[in-house]
Amino acid sequence: MPTLTTLRKAVLISLYGSAALAAFSPAAMAQSTEAGATDGPVQTVSVVGSRRVASSATDTMVPVDIIPMSRVAEQGGQFDLAQSLQYISPSFNSTRQTGADGADLVDSAALRGLGSDQTLVLVNGKRRHTTALVNLFGARNRGNTGTDMNAIPLLAIKNVQVLRDGAAAQYGSDAIAGVIDIELKKSLGCEAVAGYSQYSAGDGKNYMTSAYCGIALGDKGTLAITGEYLDRGRSNRADADSMRIIGDTKSQNKTLYLNGDYATSGTGKLYFTAGAQTRDASSAAFGRGGIGSDDIPSRNSAAMYPDGFVPFINGKIDDQYATIGHRSQIGEWHADFSQTYGYNKMRYDISHTLNASIANLDLMNGGKGVSASSFDAGGFSFQQLTSNADFSRYYDTVMRGMNVAFGAEYRSEEYKIMAGEPGSYSDVDGVGVGGNGRSQGFPGFQPGDVTKAKRHSIA
């Protein structure tokens, strides 16, 4: 694919810079002045790779990359988190796919070249759910269910911490490749960003607007609100006479995120995070030939697409995430109780297509040989509920410092598959006769595929 225009990076840097200068926060300015007068080195706090509360990056025993969002904006010049980290973190990789039957609608991410379901993603130190999509049909990360990194707006993020080492013993088997912790902002003040980009070939136009505002909840807490709208245009690098479209998918994202905390009695603090995103995306499947090709009548109808056609796999994705918890001090012990909810749903709508068996039956019955050109192909959903109770204490006089931590976790998960409409999966002209059954581009889920499965785990 061609390189991005230099206009993209220049516009992004200037917009992020001007947004930061325009942010109004008297409290933040006062903190900056006070911090500048303080002697001593500034330490960055890391929450991955250690159960110790407020450990610095130099205290951890494992390699942790702490990537501030200011660096991402200046060096990456991207509009979404997955592609931004691709240019910043050496161990992180996210590859946009094409013609992958739904996997190209979600940019799954991974560490160290391992599967996307072997990288654990946290938000403010709490487990984030994976997508409902299982990557199949020859896609990258085949058989994996990754985490949708692009469901979180960039402007809501303070920094990203990447643990570039296996952490299965501490976090579970889904952390074999490493851990990514996304820390959200709670700073006071408001800022806004607008961006535009395109490829040098003139396609793949991207429009992004995002706004952040952090407000004080009296003198006891803060509430941060972030909204983002991202419109990514389709690109195509196939030959002019090709029956394929090879390039970025078309996507429209609408995202809202809340993050904050509120001090309770004593040393306790209530914290909360909530976010929701709706995404309408569209990718191109493999093309079908027209008159004179072997695709008629098996995969096409001369009456509908005499010159051939490219089916489009359209997906509507709903993603929801919420965490509420309470941290306090019980004697010398740090206590943290939390409840996390995650939900991801994806519905397929196949357009610019046909069911060749329906078209062939229509032709056999004296009709023109047509079928419907769009189908509801069904979909799937995934829900996860996680309850945690964590306790830790640091003994600074034992063996030059020793941290003791223990806790419990209960997790409940539910997975569903929904059937599509009959035309998306039926074969009406007889098996092995004439046109192939099912919608071209992506076959719909049948009633026999319908699933509602649950599982529970305690640790």
Residue spans for each PLM region:
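Extracytoplasmic beta-strand/coil segments of soluble accessory domains associated
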Residues: 53, 83-131
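Residues that define the transmembrane beta-barrel architecture of outer-membrane proteins
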Residues: 174-176, 197, 203-209, 250-254, ...
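N-terminal Sec signal peptide and the immediately downstream disordered periplasmic leader
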Residues: 1-84, 88, 149-152, 210-215, ...
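Membrane-embedded beta-strand positions of outer-membrane beta-barrel proteins
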Residues: 190-194, 225-227, 272-274, 337-339, ...
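Transmembrane beta-barrel wall of Gram-negative outer-membrane proteins
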Residues: 191, 201-307, 311-331
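A beta-strand signature from Gram-negative outer-membrane beta-barrel systems
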Residues: 128, 143-193
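Outer-membrane beta-barrel and related beta-rich outer-membrane complex signature
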Residues: 133-135, 232-241, 271-298, 338-357, ...
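Outer-membrane beta-barrel transmembrane domain signature of Gram-negative proteins
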Residues: 301, 309-322, 341, 353-459
